[in-house]
């Protein structure tokens, strides 16, 4: 018995030495493609950092992030948690039928931030309506999959009340048309309208919302059943997979929709990104070989993306979209209607939106955000003034 104990101790010490040695010898990684985030760097060793505790915290984060074979350990940990029937893993919920869900609890909701964001949009709409017809200003909140696909959630999942906040925010919006897409999405909850391993909606979910928005604004749209589906990849694992790192996770498909000529909407436009880069499509096929394949839509998020669509039904209409990443799958459809579209992402744009609208002769405005992003966003104040 004593011999076995000694052997186990030797094996354990050797294992620790191997992991520690490997971690020291291996070059630090700056970015984890699997987790889709930058990893911690060594903390600065200063007296102030030691006394404040920043050095100790930074060292803990650094050692955790740079441990040898980190991705493998996380995968093993996830496997053990799943074997123990744990559905709360890495800040996400493991649901039914291969669906994972973003975990945003009631405690994560900042009521004061919501009030600030609502006020910013209210003020923006009031100002925009001085130059744009109110009927051409619209507001669209996208529900997260946890609301639309609640039947796929694991038992005892705690999520903030999306319906309550969508109702509350929509009722406060004036000087605009409010497009509520919940009923349309809920009626298709058995369809593939949200990715299983990512927090975004699929192109089908986005198109259903686009149809609803067109109905609300008086624009034309082609029935979904009449469109041609074109699959770009069947090997997508998104943001929720990056949190959980489950080796058994499903792969998602990414696709576009087009007309009977097999041409995807948004694939034959002229784009200018951040006033510099030029391209001729809303789709970046190079991203399909990368980890974050959702970047297939526009290549990434940018401060401004200007789109010119020569085949649009209304060449005299110029749409401004204030957006988060959920708009990236939505906007290509709008190229069928608007001769010009500009997307502004306030996370990366520091200009004056009012001046931009005047300079570019904007005729229509859409504010499109996912509800989770809207209630937590800290950049919407940019709508009503300079930085």
What is the predicted role of each segment?
Residues 1-387:
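Extracellular glycan-modifying ectodomains
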């Amino acid at each position: 018995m004593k011999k076995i104990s000694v052997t186990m101790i030797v094996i354990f010490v050797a294992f620790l030495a191997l992991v520690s040695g490997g971690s020291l010898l291996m070059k630090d990684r700056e970015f984890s493609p699997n987790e889709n985030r930058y990893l911690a760097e060594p903390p600065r060793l200063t007296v102030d950092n030691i006394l404040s505790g920043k050095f100790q915290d930074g060292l803990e984060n650094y050692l955790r992030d740079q441990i040898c074979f980190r991705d493998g350990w996380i995968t093993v940990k996830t496997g053990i948690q799943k074997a123990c029937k744990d559905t709360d893993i890495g800040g996400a919920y493991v649901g039914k039928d291969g669906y994972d869900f973003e975990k945003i609890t009631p405690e994560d909701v900042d009521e004061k931030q919501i009030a600030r964001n609502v006020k910013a949009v209210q003020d923006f709409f009031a100002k925009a309506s001085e130059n744009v017809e109110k009927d051409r200003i619209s507001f669209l909140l996208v529900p997260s999959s946890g609301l639309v696909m609640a039947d796929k959630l694991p038992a005892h999942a705690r999520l903030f009340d999306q319906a309550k906040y969508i109702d509350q925010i929509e009722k406060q919006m004036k000087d605009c048309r409010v497009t509520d897409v919940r009923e349309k999405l809920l009626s298709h909850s058995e369809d593939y309208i949200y990715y299983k391993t990512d927090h975004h909606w699929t192109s089908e979910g986005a198109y259903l919302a686009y149809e609803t928005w067109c109905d609300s604004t008086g624009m034309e749209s082609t029935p979904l059943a009449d469109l041609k589906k074109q699959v770009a990849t069947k090997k997508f694992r998104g943001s929720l997979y990056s949190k959980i790192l489950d080796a058994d996770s499903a792969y998602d498909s990414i696709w576009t929709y087009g007309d009977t000529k097999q041409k995807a909407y948004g694939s034959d436009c002229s784009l200018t990104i951040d006033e510099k880069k030029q391209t001729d499509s809303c789709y970046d096929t190079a991203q399909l070989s990368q980890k974050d394949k959702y970047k297939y839509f526009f290549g990434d998020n940018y401060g401004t993306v200007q789109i010119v669509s020569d085949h649009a039904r209304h060449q005299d209409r110029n749409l401004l979209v204030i957006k988060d990443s959920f708009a990236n799958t939505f906007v290509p459809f709008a190229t069928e209607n608007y001769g010009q579209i500009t997307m502004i992402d306030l996370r990366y744009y520091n200009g004056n939106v009012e001046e931009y609208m005047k300079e570019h002769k904007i005729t229509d405005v859409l504010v499109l955000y996912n509800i989770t992003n809207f209630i937590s966003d800290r950049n919407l104040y940019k709508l009503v003034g300079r930085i």
